[in-house]
Protein backbone atom coordinates (compact mmCIF):
# COMPACT_ATOMS: atom_id res chain seq x y z
CA UNK A 1 0.00 0.00 0.00
CA UNK A 2 2.99 2.31 0.39
CA UNK A 3 3.13 3.21 -3.29
CA UNK A 4 -0.41 4.66 -3.17
CA UNK A 5 0.46 7.50 -0.78
CA UNK A 6 0.52 11.08 -2.05
CA UNK A 7 4.25 11.78 -2.60
CA UNK A 8 3.88 15.49 -1.78
CA UNK A 9 2.11 14.86 1.55
CA UNK A 10 4.69 12.23 2.47
CA UNK A 11 7.53 14.74 2.05
CA UNK A 12 5.96 17.76 3.77
CA UNK A 13 8.43 19.19 6.27
CA UNK A 14 11.46 17.55 4.63
CA UNK A 15 11.82 18.81 1.06
CA UNK A 16 8.25 19.86 0.23
CA UNK A 17 6.51 23.13 1.22
CA UNK A 18 2.81 23.84 1.72
CA UNK A 19 0.93 25.61 -1.09
CA UNK A 20 -1.06 27.61 1.49
CA UNK A 21 0.68 29.38 4.37
CA UNK A 22 -1.44 31.13 7.01
CA UNK A 23 -2.50 30.97 10.65
CA UNK A 24 -6.07 30.88 11.95
CA UNK A 25 -7.92 30.37 15.20
CA UNK A 26 -9.60 26.92 15.48
CA UNK A 27 -13.11 28.36 15.13
CA UNK A 28 -12.21 30.22 11.91
CA UNK A 29 -10.07 27.45 10.39
CA UNK A 30 -12.81 25.88 8.24
CA UNK A 31 -13.79 29.31 6.90
CA UNK A 32 -10.18 30.04 5.87
CA UNK A 33 -9.93 26.63 4.22
CA UNK A 34 -13.12 27.26 2.23
CA UNK A 35 -11.73 30.66 1.21
CA UNK A 36 -8.62 28.93 -0.19
CA UNK A 37 -10.80 26.55 -2.20
CA UNK A 38 -12.88 29.45 -3.53
CA UNK A 39 -9.72 31.33 -4.60
CA UNK A 40 -8.28 28.33 -6.46
CA UNK A 41 -11.51 27.42 -8.27
CA UNK A 42 -12.17 31.07 -9.25
CA UNK A 43 -8.67 31.52 -10.73
CA UNK A 44 -8.93 28.22 -12.65
CA UNK A 45 -12.25 29.27 -14.20
CA UNK A 46 -10.87 32.72 -15.04
CA UNK A 47 -7.84 31.23 -16.83
CA UNK A 48 -10.06 28.74 -18.70
CA UNK A 49 -12.13 31.64 -20.04
CA UNK A 50 -8.97 33.55 -21.06
CA UNK A 51 -7.80 30.63 -23.28
CA UNK A 52 -4.18 31.16 -22.31
CA UNK A 53 -2.62 28.74 -24.80
CA UNK A 54 -3.67 28.24 -28.45
CA UNK A 55 -2.92 24.51 -28.02
CA UNK A 56 -5.81 24.25 -25.55
CA UNK A 57 -3.55 23.78 -22.51
CA UNK A 58 -4.32 26.34 -19.81
CA UNK A 59 -0.79 26.10 -18.42
CA UNK A 60 -1.73 26.60 -14.76
CA UNK A 61 1.06 24.95 -12.76
CA UNK A 62 0.01 25.87 -9.23
CA UNK A 63 -1.41 28.60 -6.98
CA UNK A 64 0.36 29.54 -3.75
CA UNK A 65 -1.59 31.45 -1.08
CA UNK A 66 0.01 33.53 1.70
CA UNK A 67 -2.29 35.21 4.22
CA UNK A 68 -1.57 37.86 6.83
CA UNK A 69 -3.87 39.96 8.99
CA UNK A 70 -4.20 42.74 6.38
CA UNK A 71 -2.99 41.02 3.19
CA UNK A 72 -3.76 38.05 0.91
CA UNK A 73 -0.92 37.36 -1.52
CA UNK A 74 -1.50 35.00 -4.44
CA UNK A 75 1.31 33.66 -6.60
CA UNK A 76 0.04 32.12 -9.83
CA UNK A 77 2.57 29.95 -11.66
CA UNK A 78 1.73 29.79 -15.37
CA UNK A 79 3.43 27.93 -18.20
CA UNK A 80 1.92 30.11 -20.94
CA UNK A 81 1.15 33.56 -19.43
CA UNK A 82 1.52 35.43 -22.74
CA UNK A 83 -2.14 36.29 -23.40
CA UNK A 84 -2.78 37.25 -19.78
CA UNK A 85 0.32 39.47 -19.59
CA UNK A 86 -0.33 41.10 -22.98
CA UNK A 87 -3.43 42.71 -21.49
CA UNK A 88 -1.51 43.87 -18.44
CA UNK A 89 -2.33 45.76 -16.35
CA UNK A 90 -5.99 45.46 -17.47
CA UNK A 91 -6.06 41.65 -17.30
CA UNK A 92 -4.57 41.46 -13.81
CA UNK A 93 -6.62 44.41 -12.56
CA UNK A 94 -9.84 42.77 -13.75
CA UNK A 95 -8.89 39.50 -12.05
CA UNK A 96 -7.97 41.32 -8.83
CA UNK A 97 -11.13 43.46 -8.68
CA UNK A 98 -13.46 40.53 -9.49
CA UNK A 99 -11.77 38.25 -6.96
CA UNK A 100 -11.93 40.92 -4.23
CA UNK A 101 -15.69 41.22 -4.74
CA UNK A 102 -16.06 37.44 -4.72
CA UNK A 103 -14.11 37.05 -1.46
CA UNK A 104 -15.49 40.16 0.27
CA UNK A 105 -12.00 40.95 1.57
CA UNK A 106 -13.05 43.87 3.76
CA UNK A 107 -9.94 45.56 5.19
CA UNK A 108 -7.55 43.01 3.69
CA UNK A 109 -5.59 43.92 0.56
CA UNK A 110 -5.29 41.44 -2.30
CA UNK A 111 -1.99 41.16 -4.17
CA UNK A 112 -1.59 38.91 -7.24
CA UNK A 113 1.80 37.97 -8.70
CA UNK A 114 2.15 36.08 -12.00
CA UNK A 115 5.25 33.87 -12.29
CA UNK A 116 6.25 32.17 -15.54
CA UNK A 117 7.30 28.52 -15.44
CA UNK A 118 10.49 28.38 -17.52
CA UNK A 119 9.94 24.80 -18.74
CA UNK A 120 6.15 24.28 -18.81
CA UNK A 121 6.25 20.60 -19.77
CA UNK A 122 8.40 19.76 -16.77
CA UNK A 123 5.33 20.46 -14.61
CA UNK A 124 2.90 17.55 -14.01
CA UNK A 125 -0.25 19.72 -13.95
CA UNK A 126 0.48 21.15 -17.40
CA UNK A 127 1.32 17.69 -18.76
CA UNK A 128 -1.92 16.30 -17.29
CA UNK A 129 -3.89 19.09 -19.02
CA UNK A 130 -2.17 18.16 -22.28
CA UNK A 131 -3.08 14.46 -21.89
CA UNK A 132 -6.67 15.40 -20.96
CA UNK A 133 -6.97 17.46 -24.15
CA UNK A 134 -5.65 14.56 -26.23
CA UNK A 135 -8.08 12.09 -24.64
CA UNK A 136 -11.04 14.42 -25.25
CA UNK A 137 -10.01 14.46 -28.92
CA UNK A 138 -10.17 10.63 -28.90
CA UNK A 139 -6.42 10.07 -29.22
CA UNK A 140 -5.49 6.62 -27.87
CA UNK A 141 -4.35 6.54 -24.23
CA UNK A 142 -0.93 5.04 -24.97
CA UNK A 143 -0.23 7.54 -27.75
CA UNK A 144 -1.21 10.49 -25.51
CA UNK A 145 1.03 9.22 -22.68
CA UNK A 146 4.00 8.70 -25.04
CA UNK A 147 3.63 12.22 -26.45
CA UNK A 148 3.51 13.67 -22.91
CA UNK A 149 6.68 11.78 -21.97
CA UNK A 150 8.42 13.09 -25.11
CA UNK A 151 7.53 16.67 -24.10
CA UNK A 152 8.81 16.02 -20.56
CA UNK A 153 12.09 14.59 -21.87
CA UNK A 154 12.58 17.71 -24.02
CA UNK A 155 12.25 19.72 -20.78
CA UNK A 156 15.20 17.75 -19.28
CA UNK A 157 13.33 15.87 -16.57
CA UNK A 158 15.29 13.18 -14.69
CA UNK A 159 12.41 10.71 -14.60
CA UNK A 160 8.67 10.56 -15.19
CA UNK A 161 5.81 8.12 -14.66
CA UNK A 162 2.39 8.63 -16.26
CA UNK A 163 -0.66 6.60 -15.27
CA UNK A 164 -4.21 6.67 -16.65
CA UNK A 165 -7.06 4.69 -15.05
CA UNK A 166 -10.68 4.11 -16.08
CA UNK A 167 -12.50 2.88 -19.17
CA UNK A 168 -9.53 3.29 -21.49
CA UNK A 169 -10.40 3.79 -25.17
CA UNK A 170 -14.05 2.99 -24.39
CA UNK A 171 -13.49 -0.54 -23.10
CA UNK A 172 -16.21 -2.07 -20.92
CA UNK A 173 -13.89 -3.01 -18.05
CA UNK A 174 -11.92 -0.28 -16.28
CA UNK A 175 -8.17 -0.82 -16.02
CA UNK A 176 -4.91 0.99 -15.34
CA UNK A 177 -2.19 1.75 -17.89
CA UNK A 178 1.15 3.39 -17.11
CA UNK A 179 4.51 4.24 -18.67
CA UNK A 180 7.75 5.10 -16.89
CA UNK A 181 10.89 6.72 -18.31
CA UNK A 182 14.07 7.47 -16.40
CA UNK A 183 14.47 7.18 -12.63
CA UNK A 184 11.39 7.48 -10.39
CA UNK A 185 12.39 6.54 -6.76
CA UNK A 186 8.99 7.02 -5.09
CA UNK A 187 10.01 5.28 -1.85
CA UNK A 188 13.05 7.51 -1.24
CA UNK A 189 12.07 10.28 1.20
CA UNK A 190 14.95 12.59 0.23
CA UNK A 191 13.88 12.40 -3.45
CA UNK A 192 12.01 15.54 -4.53
CA UNK A 193 8.93 15.02 -6.70
CA UNK A 194 6.37 17.01 -8.62
CA UNK A 195 3.05 15.16 -8.62
CA UNK A 196 -0.53 15.69 -9.70
CA UNK A 197 -3.79 13.77 -9.81
CA UNK A 198 -6.09 15.07 -12.54
CA UNK A 199 -9.64 13.85 -13.44
CA UNK A 200 -10.84 14.21 -17.04
CA UNK A 201 -14.39 13.73 -18.30
CA UNK A 202 -14.63 11.90 -21.65
CA UNK A 203 -17.53 10.40 -23.62
CA UNK A 204 -16.69 7.03 -22.01
CA UNK A 205 -16.76 8.35 -18.44
CA UNK A 206 -14.26 9.90 -16.04
CA UNK A 207 -10.59 8.92 -16.34
CA UNK A 208 -7.97 9.58 -13.68
CA UNK A 209 -4.53 10.86 -14.72
CA UNK A 210 -1.58 10.66 -12.32
CA UNK A 211 1.89 12.00 -13.09
CA UNK A 212 5.09 11.70 -11.03
CA UNK A 213 8.13 13.77 -12.09
CA UNK A 214 11.47 13.18 -10.36
CA UNK A 215 13.21 16.52 -9.75
CA UNK A 216 16.30 15.46 -7.78
CA UNK A 217 17.55 14.40 -4.36
CA UNK A 218 17.96 16.68 -1.35
CA UNK A 219 21.44 16.58 0.17
Swiss-Prot record:
| Cellular compartment(s) | Plastid
What Pfam families has UniProt attached to this entry?
Ribosomal_S3_C
| Keyword set includes RNA-binding | yes
Q: GO biological process annotations for this chain's record?
A: translation
Q: Assembly and partners? A: Part of the 30S ribosomal subunit.
Record flagged with keyword Membrane:
no
Annotated source species: Cuscuta obtusiflora
Q: What are the record keywords, sorted?
A: Plastid, Ribonucleoprotein, Ribosomal protein, RNA-binding, rRNA-binding
Q: Which GO terms describe its molecular function?
A: rRNA binding; structural constituent of ribosome
GO CC, alphabetical: cytosolic small ribosomal subunit; plastid
Superkingdom is Eukaryota
* Record field: transmembrane: none
InterPro entries, alphabetized: KH_dom-like_a/b, KH_sf_prok-type, Ribosomal_S3_C_sf, Ribosomal_uS3_bac-typ, Ribosomal_uS3_C
Q: Which family does it belong to?
A: Belongs to the universal ribosomal protein uS3 family.
Identify this protein by name.
Answer: Small ribosomal subunit protein uS3c
Q: Where is the KH type-2 domain?
A: 39-118
Q: Which Gene3D superfamilies match?
A: 3.30.300.20, Ribosomal protein S3, C-terminal domain
Amino acid sequence: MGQKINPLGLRLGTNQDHYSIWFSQPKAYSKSLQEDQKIRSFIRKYIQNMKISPSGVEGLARISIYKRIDLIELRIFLGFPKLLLENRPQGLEKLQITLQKELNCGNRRLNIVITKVEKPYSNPNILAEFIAGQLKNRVSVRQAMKKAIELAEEADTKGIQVQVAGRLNGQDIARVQWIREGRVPRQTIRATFDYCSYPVRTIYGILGIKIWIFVGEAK
